[in-house]
Amino acid sequence: MALTADEKTQIINEYATHEGDTGSPEVQVALLSKRIADLTEHLKEHKHDHHSRRGMQLMIGDRRRLLDYLKRVDINRYRSLIERLGLRR
């Protein structure tokens, strides 16, 4: 369920804006999106796992705030990221 180190490294390398980038909004949103997708699959089987559901809702809020920030700062990077991740907006 948790991201393995290899998965995390692969996502970071794919969405990094420069070498050694682990904190840009793009990387953070991509990592959150992967964790949200994994939790969504978990919750399809375990419908009464409310603790995990709340954690997922908090992650969705974090991702929303990061996307709002990116949209406010650089609309082109925002649009590119939304398209690459396949998020609805």
From Swiss-Prot:
Coiled coil feature spans: none
UniProt record, GO biological process: translation
GO molecular function terms listed in the Swiss-Prot or TrEMBL record: rRNA binding; structural constituent of ribosome
Source organism superkingdom: Bacteria
InterPro entries assigned: Ribosomal_uS15, Ribosomal_uS15_bac-type, uS15_NS1_RNA-bd_sf
CDD domains linked to this entry: Ribosomal_S15p_S13e
Cellular component, GO, one term: cytosolic small ribosomal subunit
Database matches in Pfam families: Ribosomal_S15
Alphabetized UniProt keyword annotations: Ribonucleoprotein, Ribosomal protein, RNA-binding, rRNA-binding
Family, as annotated: Belongs to the universal ribosomal protein uS15 family.
Purpose of the protein: One of the primary rRNA binding proteins, it binds directly to 16S rRNA where it helps nucleate assembly of the platform of the 30S subunit by binding and bridging several RNA helices of the 16S rRNA.
Subunit structure: Part of the 30S ribosomal subunit. Forms a bridge to the 50S subunit in the 70S ribosome, contacting the 23S rRNA.
NCBIfam families in the cross-refs: S15_bact
HAMAP family in alphabetical order: Ribosomal_uS15_B
Official protein name in the record: Small ribosomal subunit protein uS15
Species of the source: Bifidobacterium longum subsp. infantis (strain ATCC 15697 / DSM 20088 / JCM 1222 / NCTC 11817 / S12)
Classification lineage: Bacteria, Bacillati, Actinomycetota, Actinomycetes, Bifidobacteriales
